Swiss-Prot record:
Distribution of this protein across tissues and organs: Expressed in the central nervous system in mushroom body neurons (at protein level).
Task performed by this protein: Functions to regulate alternative splicing in neurons by binding pre-mRNA in a sequence-specific manner to activate exon inclusion. Plays a role in long-term memory formation by processing the unspliced Orb2-isoform A (Orb2A) mRNA and thereby controlling Orb2A protein abundance.
UniProt superkingdom: Eukaryota
Entry protein name: RNA-binding protein Pasilla
Record domain KH: where: 273-340, 366-432, 691-758
Statement: the UniProt record of this protein carries the keyword Calcium: no
Effect on the protein of changing residue 466 to L: In both embryo and larva, results in irregularly shaped salivary glands with bulges of variable sizes, leading to greater distances between neighboring nuclei
Entry's localization field: Nucleus; Cytoplasm
Summary of the knockout phenotype: In both embryo and larva, results in irregularly shaped salivary glands with bulges of variable sizes, leading to greater distances between neighboring nuclei and decreased apical secretion.
Record keywords, A-Z: Cytoplasm, mRNA processing, mRNA splicing, Nucleus, Repeat, RNA-binding
Length: 780
């Protein structure tokens, strides 16, 4: 601030001195004309000086006003209530005075003219023998001294932008003129500068009081009239500070700027925005986005919300559903939610059978809403003792369940599944959204891509396996999804389970008897997922439609069969067998058989020596758990091929292995391809109609042995056996007992394997506990 005041005072002194010189020249010219009539001897000298004085006067009049004069006249600072103009400045500074001789010289061009003015004025004063030259007082000397000091150390105002304010004209209604590209002038004057000008003018007026009173009065009157005219012409009120940059708000405005900033934030940002993340089936996401993104763009424009969708092959871990993030006000979020719910109803998903354990009724995907919330928000939705989630169920009429909390630190979200009618689901979503609004941490998980998440993740269907294995995007599927497809179409080893994974599908042609009643509804859904998989792989829309149309014709007449052939199982996709419910031993058996008959893949017969075959299978199964002998003992009655190939039943008679991908049959020796059904013929939809189910009671105190840490044991049992394993909810027991009900669904062989693995887990846990009892006794 001191530097600003210093520059302002120096500039004011410069202007005053210039004005003094102009007024003094006029007075001296008048005195010269009077002296010409009174004293004739001095007339030649006056004639010599008169042209020079007139030249100096003309030069001063033609000089441009200074930067300070223009700014002080045209623009009023934001926080100053006074105005200034060149005329008013002249009127304040008007007055006669005499100057002493100046011996200082100027280094700048702009200052040299003013010095010459002062020196010439001094000469004229000496020649005219004016009595007023003796009345120079200390105040005027101080003003001259300030001007000389300014010459010695010139300051450039352009290098002192400490408090620069952008000014923009006001319109008639008082609002700033927001014309793009308009350049606004800059004001460097302030109230302090105006005060400095006034004080300097007062000092100059006191210094020049004396014999020039009449001329001073005339000058003051003229200057004051010109000042009033200039102020009338300039509409100073039409300018208002629009923005101010300085070293801090406290320098310029204080509370006033703070209020304006708050108002601007309210205008620009509007209502507070919130975030809701939901899961959308892949088959319905295209309808939400629209052709070229037109639908989603129109939705965002109409609602004012932002809708962000994950990429076509980027699914939420453990599912085949894309992630949709909605950002906006609560009203906009609910409008978008209703739109998405309608699109899901128009595009039914393959996972259309999810069992509600409370009502024991099957629910379709179009009656579900899946919401992802952070762990903190999930806790608020559950409420103390489950009070709020119970309230949601009662008031909305929808079934609501939250997935288990994941242990993986990379995934801090839980999935809320809402099942019911559209209106009921909307009411439930509103209640959930109210908790999202209350939670300050609800906006911590705003990502839509989960490509970097690995390990077990929360299952979207909490009634089944609590965790699902995460694979790459096109192969992502939950255990619940696999089991649902298997039970719907005919088991875990079904074409539906095969097709969901997108890759590794063998399409076989059924040349046997026609299928009397092909399941066209299932075929349509399978073909829809083939279409999604092909689009994700980069196929064009034309190619995809042609391929799906051809497959639909084959499926219509029951000619199309889907399954896994030996050639594909031989390492073509390492994780495919697990997803299809094919056990590790089945893959090892198929791999050994394929290696032995590699030269006869498309031939009718391939000779395999069972001794060599048994040795290959035994070596392949040595590293796996459970061992081959244990599984043989559990499933010997269901799988004669594995029984023949076991180490306990060697045979020297070669057995033919038909590896024909078209399902042709042939017999050689004592064994037929009918005994090798899993490897000799790809199943058709007509072959996948049988399923079975079995309930096993497990004590409540030991049910954790089946679940395992983070549910991994249950996932392992399902993958190894190929069966679907469901455990009753906590608190639901078999009648009259404290035993939880474990339901095993699948093919008979898969059920037997799963039951054996469950019993093995229970025995291991009981043995472990029995060993801990003596140790506890000894310690005590």
């Amino acid at each position: 601030m001191e530097s600003i005041m210093k520059v302002a005072m120096d500039k004011a002194a410069e202007q005053l001195i210039q004005q003094f010189g102009f007024d003094y020249l006029q007075q001296q010219l008048q005195l010269q004309h009077q002296n010409q009539h009174n004293s004739s001897p001095q007339q030649p000298q006056h004639q010599q000086l008169e042209p020079e004085n007139e030249h100096l006067t003309y030069q001063y009049q033609q000089s441009k006003p200074t930067h300070m004069q223009q700014l002080a006249c045209n623009y009023q600072p934001r926080h100053s209530t006074t105005t200034s103009s060149p005329s008013s400045t002249h009127s304040l500074a008007s007055g006669g005075g005499s100057s002493s001789n100046s011996s200082n010289s100027s280094s700048s061009d702009s200052s040299s003219i003013n010095i010459s003015h002062i020196s010439n004025i001094s000469n004229i004063s000496n020649i005219g023998n004016i009595s007023n030259s003796n009345h120079s007082n200390a105040a005027y000397s101080l003003a001259v001294h300030s001007y000389q000091k300014q010459i010695e150390s010139p300051a450039n105002p352009s290098h002192v932008p400490h408090h620069q304010m952008d000014l923009s004209p006001l319109s008639e209604n008082g609002s700033p003129n927001g014309t793009p590209g308009a350049q606004t002038p800059t004001a460097t004057a302030s109230g302090n500068t105006a005060a400095a000008l006034a004080s300097a003018a007062a000092a100059a007026a006191a210094a020049t009081s004396g014999g020039n009173g009449s001329s001073i009065t005339n000058c003051n009157s003229n200057n004051s009239s010109s000042s009033s005219n200039a102020q009338q012409q300039l509409q100073l009120g039409n300018y208002k500070t629009n923005s101010c940059w300085c070293y801090g708000e406290s320098v310029c405005s204080g509370i006033e700027v703070e209020i304006e900033n708050n108002n601007n934030n309210h205008i620009h940002h509007g209502e507070t925005t919130y975030h809701m993340k939901i899961l959308v089936p892949a088959v319905a996401s295209g309808a939400i986005i629209g052709k070229g993104g037109e639908t989603i763009a129109s939705l965002q424009k109409d609602t004012g919300a932002r809708v962000k969708m994950s990429k076509s092959h980027d699914f939420y871990p453990g599912t085949t559903e894309r992630v949709c993030l909605i950002t906006g006000s609560t009203e906009a979020i609910m409008v978008v939610m209703e739109f998405i719910m309608d699109k899901i109803r128009e595009k039914p998903d393959l996972t259309n059978k999810i069992v509600d354990t409370d009502s024991k009724q099957t629910q379709e995907r179009d009656k579900q809403v899946k919401i992802l919330v952070p762990n903190s928000t999930a806790g608020m939705i559950i409420g103390k003792g489950g009070a709020f989630i119970k309230q949601i169920k009662e008031e909305s009429g929808s079934y609501v369940q939250i997935s288990q909390k994941p242990t993986d630190v990379s995934l801090q979200e839980r999935c809320i599944t809402i099942i019911g009618d559209k209106e009921n689901n909307k009411n439930a979503c509103k209640m959930i959204l109210s908790k999202i609004v209350e939670d300050p941490q609800s906006g911590t998980c705003l990502n839509v891509s989960y490509a970097d998440v690995s390990g077990p993740v929360a299952n979207f269907n909490p009634t089944g396996s609590p965790y699902a294995t995460n694979q790459n995007a096109i192969n992502s599927s939950t255990a619940s999804l696999n089991s649902t497809l298997g039970t719907t179409i005919g088991g875990a080893n079904s074409a539906a389970s095969l097709l969901v994974n997108g890759t590794g599908i063998n399409l076989s042609i059924n040349l046997g008897s026609p299928n009397p009643a092909p399941n066209l509804a299932v075929a349509t859904q399978l073909l829809e997922h083939i279409k999604v998989a092909m689009r994700g792989s980069g196929y064009s829309e034309t190619v995809t439609n042609e391929v799906v149309a051809a497959l639909s014709v084959l499926a219509k007449y029951g000619v199309l069969g889907m399954g896994v052939g030996v050639s594909h199982t031989n390492g073509a996709h390492s994780t495919l067998g697990n997803f299809l419910g094919v056990t590790t031993l089945d893959q090892q058996t198929a791999a050994a058989a394929s290696a032995a008959t590699a030269s006869n893949v498309f031939g009718a017969v391939g000779q395999v020596n069972l001794e060599q075959y048994a040795a290959a299978v035994a070596s392949a199964a040595a590293a796996s758990r459970p061992t081959q002998s244990q599984l043989d003992a559990a499933a010997v009655q269901f799988d004669p091929f594995r029984h023949l190939g076991s180490a306990t039943a060697p045979a020297a008679t070669p057995v033919s292995l038909n590896n024909n991908s078209f399902g042709l049959t042939a017999t050689t020796g004592t064994a037929t391809t009918a005994q090798l059904g899993g490897l000799s013929k790809s199943p058709t939809p007509g072959d996948l109609s049988s399923k079975d189910s079995k309930n096993v009671e497990v004590p409540e105190v030991i049910i954790g042995a089946i679940l395992g840490p983070s549910g991994r044991s249950l996932v392992e049992i399902q993958h190894v056996s190929g069966a679907n394993v469901q455990i009753s909810k906590k608190g639901i027991f078999a009648p009259g007992t404290r035993n939880r009900i474990v339901t095993i669904t699948g093919q008979p062989s898969a059920i037997a394997k799963a039951q054996y693995l469950i019993e093995q887990k229970i025995n291991e846990e009981e043995t472990k506990r029995a060993r801990q009892i003596p140790l506890t006794t000894v310690v005590n």
